[in-house]
Amino acid sequence: MMTKNDRPRVALVIGSGSVKCAAALGLMKVLEREHIDVDMVVGCSGGAIYASLIALGWPVQRAIDTTLKMWTRDVTAKRNTRAILQLALPWIFKFDESFGLINDRMINRRFRDGFEGATFAQTRIPLFVTATDLYNGEQVVISEGV
């Protein structure tokens, strides 16, 4: 039998795609059933949400229940009208750090509640979240903080 030090390291990388990234929970169910440990989790955009749930070490069913509470029709149906104007008329409605097609106030509230205030410090598996710096367009890797 392989010890943890002998076995290959496993990194689970979850790309972007909004709630479609929840498919990663199905993969986690299989990994859990087969007793395959994940050594690090990486997520981008919607994938960062599920990477975070996995990195916290929550059982898959708890992550599924949290997903069902966070992603409801009232959250996904909210549109940011100003953002549509910013896309259509960028020379009048300038882009800034508040740009987003979906109004994020409700989403942020749901995520704070869903994650129960968890931070990177509480993850059981190392977590890396990739993002884009809006000021210079460069990739940023976040692995600590709130």
Task: Locate each region found by the language model.
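Patatin-like phospholipase
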Residues: 6-109, 141-146
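N-terminal low-complexity/intrinsically disordered extensions
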Residues: 1-5
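Helix-loop "lid/cap" segments that line or gate small-molecule binding pockets
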Residues: 110-114
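Active-site gating loop/helix substructures
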Residues: 119-146
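A short alpha-helix-loop-beta-strand transition element characteristic
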Residues: 73-78, 115-126
